[in-house]
């Protein structure tokens, strides 16, 4: 019985690991695009609250099985922070 549970747990964790790999690949691609945006907007502010609100609104209108507004907002708030910091650092490096 315990061996079956351990095997099931191992399989589920392998699925999570695969999803984590996909998520990190997607985040890396998102940052690549964010860098392109930062280069275009060099003279403009990086922070665009209107755009962030639009993204959150669009995502909150999607139908998810388990994601709710609180989870989406929390997750994307962190994604936005990471993206802004990445853009800021990239632009600082260009100015050196």
Where do the protein language model's features map onto the residues?
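Domain-level signature for soluble enzymes in the chorismate/prephenate branch of the shikimate pathway
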Residues: 1-96
């Amino acid at each position: 019985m315990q061996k079956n549970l351990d095997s099931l747990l191992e399989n589920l964790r392998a699925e999570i690991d695969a999803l984590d790999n996909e998520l990190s690949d997607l985040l890396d691609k998102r940052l690549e695009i964010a860098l392109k945006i930062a280069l275009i907007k060099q003279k403009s502010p990086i922070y665009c609250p209107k755009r962030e609100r639009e993204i959150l609104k669009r995502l909150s209108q999607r139908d998810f099985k388990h994601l709710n507004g609180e989870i989406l907002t929390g997750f994307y708030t962190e994604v936005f922070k990471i993206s802004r910091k990445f853009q800021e650092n990239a632009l600082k490096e260009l100015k050196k």
